[in-house]
Amino acid sequence: MKILEIYDKQIAEKEGNIFIFISKWIISVDHKNIGTMYTNFSILAGIVGTLLSLVIRMELSTGNMLDGDGQQYNVIVTAHGLIMIFFVVMPAMLGGFANWFIPIMVGSPDVAFPRLNNISLWLIIVSFFLLLTSSCVGIGVGTGWTVYPPLSTMEYHPGHAVDVGILSLHIAGASSLLGAINFLTTVFNMKIAGLSWSKVSLFVWSILITAVLLVLSLPVLAGGLTMLITDRNFETTFFDPIGGGDPILYQHLFWFFGHPEVYILILPGFGLVSIILSKYSNKGIFGVKGMISAMSAIGFLGFLVWAHHMYTVGLDVDTRAYFTAATMIIAIPTGIKIFSWLATLWGGVIKITTPMLFVIGFLVLFTIGGLTGVVLANGGLDISLHDTYYVVAHFHYVLSMGAIFAIFAGYYYYYSIMNSTRLFGVVRYNEQLGRIHFWTMFIGVNVTFFPMHFLGLAGMPRRIGDYPDAYIGWNLIASYGSLITAFGLLFFVVNIFTPYIRRSVNIKNGAIILMGLDFARDWQIGFQDPATPIMEGIIDLHNYIFFYLIVVAVFIGWVMGRILWRFSYKWSYPTIGDIEIFKNFTAYNQIIHGTVIEIVWTLIPTVILYLIAIPSFTLLYAMDEIINPTVTIKIIGHQWYWSYEYGDNASNLIEFDSYMVYERDLAEGQLRLLEVDNAMVVPVKTHIRLIITSGDVLHSWAIPSFGIKVDAVPGRLNQIGLYVKREGTFYGQCSELCGVDHGFMPIKVQAVKLGEYFSKLNEK
């Protein structure tokens, strides 16, 4: 004991020594210290990103917080997206947990390149501050996290803000690439002798596959960003149609990285979930080889589906059909993982702790996000839902609730290991605070993001800081949900610091009062009323797909509820009947390791996807047909307005512009952000060809009731057929980032009889 007391005294003295502090933290090459610094950095960045998200939700709840400054809103949205992806999830997963536990799990004393590990950490920190700087330089980076040209070119984003942002992403990419190379080398070259690949932890496998994805995808992003920065500063024209370039090339390069990036964010979470699930169900993971194969398949297929983010840019229908099929196939290995986790729970003795609660929350919410992903995979349905809040809801269920819940589960699970020291002793989180954190956050994120599905179905475009009054109800509810989520995160912050300050925390009862909401108009929980056969087909296909997805969701929910009811420690106990199957060795082997049951639940999603695919392809090819058009209308997108060109019955070319009517000029009964000075006119029950292009940046011509959403791309002529079945006035909006501080670009279409159509043209 005397030796330990002397050691503790020396440790206490060293903690106050600045040189020892620098040696331990600033220039440390110890993988544990670096992992701790990564984790603390991701918590700090997460606080910044969460505060930005609260600003977004407050703006969307009032519309006046930023005084109508669309560029400032887009700068905040861009910073929020980039921070949460590159500086929260990736540092926590790959920098924090991977650095801490990969060497331990493979029996290595440290990572292969400790100094490379240190520089990787400091590169990501430098990158983070560069990103924050880019938001404050000039007009900021208001391009969205995708940084699409032409909006990101010097013409539309002058100054150095975008250049600094690109430099930040380059440095962050270099940091991730160095880390990936380090982990690959560590696992392959430093794995302890006798540890077979089949016995390597699923977390190690997940990091290994993630590292491969990083090595293969990041150079493509770096190439695209380098081409963009040379377009901005050195007069190259990689993405400028005037010089023979194509802005769609950038989208291909970006999404070839961007979609594997989704799996880079979520795969380490799969590994953490597997570890925690096995621990607190007191069982080995069901079908380990199947789980490894599923993760490998997800990683491989992730490189083959990037263009499902680009269904509206004018891709050939056969190309869209391929990406639809390839994207839906990813649901099969993902389904295998969900079913394998459920099989792990079945028959175990489940202990409900804070990490286990977050894992169960992960399973529920990730499943919902995956099911909506099957909807968006359809090239036909996505035409209506692309760039709406349905997409926002989908990827937040996968990332904000999937990856983030996995991070919280892992942090609570490894909290004592990662934070205990000789100075502070063994530190433990407060279980009650952890549970309060889970339930408030679980409720908060669902209240925030679930209503966004309804906003998307009704056609609310994303990336816009204000919106027609019809959408105010669900936006208010989502904003209340964000406050509940932030309130829950306070319990997390208190919980992780309480063990150090060693003070008791008294939790007082409180209440949140929700004001009565007055829902405007009738755009609430479904699509707008269809006006074309295409929109009717979209609604029918959506309902058809949802029938199968709801069946799957109900089945998974029933199984999970049954498991928690029958096998939870202290809730109930397994009965003799529950464990009867384990008396039979063959049956036991099938439940624990067998392939027969895996084949069965591989076939289940395969059959469901096949049943979904047939009507999906039918609708997709029907949408591509343009049947003997008698009217052709050319639509040109500009910043602030739309231009329309079409001929009358005497073949005279008629041109006019369509600007939004500002709120101060609206007549009584007119709709804010939807009225225009010159409405587009189309004849009913007539086949029409629409030719859509852009005169400056990317735009999106979208009418929810028509089931039409087509990108207007500079240098390209995208066309689509239109057949309006009924008379009426129909509204839409541009759903792309259409310029720096651009005005809203509403679309108003009047569908009239053919005779009245020509009369209105003559008036114009």
From Swiss-Prot:
Class of the enzyme per the UniProt entry, highest EC level: translocase
Span list, region COX2: 486-764
Binding site for O2: Y263
Transmembrane segments: 36-56, 82-102, 121-141, 164-184, 202-222, 253-273, 285-305, 329-349, 356-376, 390-410, 438-458, 477-497, 545-565, 594-614
Residues reported in the UniProt entry to bind heme a3: H394
Any one of the GO BP annotations: respiratory electron transport chain
Region ranges (COX1): 1-485
Annotated GO MF terms: copper ion binding; cytochrome-c oxidase activity; heme binding
Annotated Cu cation A binding sites: H699, C734, C738, H742
Enzyme Commission code(s) on record: 7.1.1.9
Cross-link (1'-histidyl-3'-tyrosine (His-Tyr)): H259-Y263
UniProt subunit comment: Component of the cytochrome c oxidase (complex IV, CIV), a multisubunit enzyme composed of a catalytic core of 3 subunits and several supernumerary subunits. The complex exists as a monomer or a dimer and forms supercomplexes (SCs) in the inner mitochondrial membrane with ubiquinol-cytochrome c oxidoreductase (cytochrome b-c1 complex, complex III, CIII).
Family (UniProt): In the N-terminal section; belongs to the heme-copper respiratory oxidase family.
Protein name: Cytochrome c oxidase subunit 1+2
Organism: Dictyostelium discoideum
